[in-house]
């Protein structure tokens, strides 16, 4: 009887628990998957204000933090736990950069937008170690809400082992003051997100003034992910990367990162200014990019899968244009920073940012994409290189030594010119990078000498190397050349010559020295171009006596004790144009609507065109190929002889048996 009561009690208890178990199971089955909304941007390059540029739709006004703020506020009203991320290169590209060091306007305005995380891009190093450190110190001193600054692959251990340089120590102190970290964990509602920052290999190659050493990005991110796994309990791992993507997947740094660190759920990919209409996907890792200068914001929604990984369920590039209202408070802050530019930096040059230098009535200048990705002559490169030559030959104290060639690399060009007024601000924005030895923003012009033989190499650099390093596309005044893209690498140029002021052809003399004008950045980047060609295409800039230049800051062009800035050279050239409308304002000559034959493409696959006039590099390559073929033939013949000999021996053994 007692046993029967125990069984009955057990059945009753089970019956009581069953509804709860069923109810709990139903709740689990119906539980909503975790979700996260993310807004991303990168490569805004000091574009706090909206600006006029040339797009596929023509000349239009785009960008601006006040319009971004409107979009972000609307998103946060919908979901207060939206994650706001930036992929670096937040500075260098407009007049705002002239107050970068003292005001830290870019970082402070990222905070104004509610951005929670950013990383360093190569252009954050443009004002050298002291400039970066001062910016970080002043940002921290502002007391404002600022984004976390994350970089996981600075190799402090290696630098400490060698002994920190003064510049490295200055940056380290700035990092400490600001609170730079490898990663951070953010709570976004019920989602715990680990965010890592990383600085890429190509970014470092594009930062000639950077004194820091970096670990391999992939290895550093792997180590950081392992650290997060050991010490944190997170739902998602995101990487803000200033590494970029390329068409060639084998060289596409953030794709390499995604493949080698599969634990990453999302990579915000900066540096290459890529605009991805759809994410790149490798395994469970998504890569997103939204383009440059704040022309777009990226908006995406992610949903967690049953296995704990995430899907992007919504992805949109939101154009930032005049259809979006400006947030008044944000625009007021931007205007205050711009007023400081007028009364400070520009006053020293005798300009204001809205001052009209020239009017462009009808000329469609090439876009930035054209300069980098359409390998031919472009009128934007022509007008800028002409400006460099003009400014040097019309500067106070000009020594009478004419400029033979002026060079503009596509990597130095930051914007184009639209129709209508060309202002001081638009000219500065078009060639805004860097700082001189004087500590004043803007790369100065330098004057060097190259031999005729080296000028031919410069043409070959554009023809052969710039497809692999698009920032090395060269636009030149005074030097014309033709190339055939189908010819052997390092042997693509078929004709190269000088053009005098009357437009006459002048043949180059291999050993003669020619005066060449470029900006300081071009000189600093020569080593990267040499590395890209494995040392085969090497230029050695010289002084007028033919002595190699050891420090490009020694050959900066000075005027009245001040550096002649590249952007100011363009501004002066614009002002020099004739006033054809007779309204007191210069007009861009219609001649710039035409291509002049400075860089001609001979797209021929005719065998005679492919092999005619081979240069020494072609001969070297052919010789190497022939030697390799001879070695292979020799090895094959040797193997054949050995096989025959062994066959004979085996046959002899069989006969003897």
Where do the model's predicted regions map?
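N-terminal secretory signal peptides that target proteins for export/translocation
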Residues: 1-3
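Sec-dependent signal peptide cleavage junction
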Residues: 18-32
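Acidic, metal/ion-coordinating pockets
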Residues: 28-323, 387, 449, 466, ...
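Catalytic centers of hydrolytic enzymes
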Residues: 32-40, 46-61, 65-71, 77, ...
